[in-house]
Amino acid sequence: MREPINVSGMVLSASPVGEYDKRVVILTRELGKITAFARGARRMKSPLMAVSNPFVFGEFQVYEGRDSYTLSGANIKEYFLDLAQMQPGVYYGFYFLELAEYFGQEGNDETQMLNLLYVTMNAIRRGKQDLRLIRCIFELRTITISGEAPQMFSCMECGTKENLTVFSLRDSAIYCQNCGKTIRDPWALQPGTVLACRYIIAAPLAKLYGFTVNEEILDELERLLRAYLHRYVEKKMKTLQILDVMK
């Protein structure tokens, strides 16, 4: 019999299989995104019932199979049970899990994404930031981790770091006011929006959720991220549809 593999991760999604089993998707540090089957997890007295739910974060023991893994046990660090009582916060949380599942890859080092999920769920439960801003931060940082961050630190054309006020969605880059006159799809941005994007892209994870913006900047940041994310996410997110209805 194969030895169990210990992995650190978070359950991104769970769905019923058969009469008593569950299929779970776990984002792990060691193996990237994996699919595992929790046998008997839907039985009332199963030790796997509580550990095979979305948001659960900790150490999991799995056995590798031909096409998937089998979940055999877990040592949970955080269940995030209080998120279920936070509305609409919990729906934002489910959206972040779905986005992480979309970008996650099997065999990749997903440490950054896993850490981002953990601090983001804690940001939701603290309740100190506008959930719309938390969403913008998570989306842009996720894109950054995936290697598709926009160039926001110098003009794409001349390289200057001054007067960066024109964004090109087509080029995924910022331009100075002068060079921006020549691009096909100029999108005028306020300096505060550019600064917010820079901070989200480069800030240490521990300080990522340590800032706020005014309503005008937040509105612009939302519009920018909606358009930018549309370029990289081909799937229609079910949880995003719920968030849109709640607006």
Describe the predicted segments one by one.
Residues 1-247:
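Non-catalytic alpha-helical scaffolds and adjoining flexible linkers that form interface surfaces
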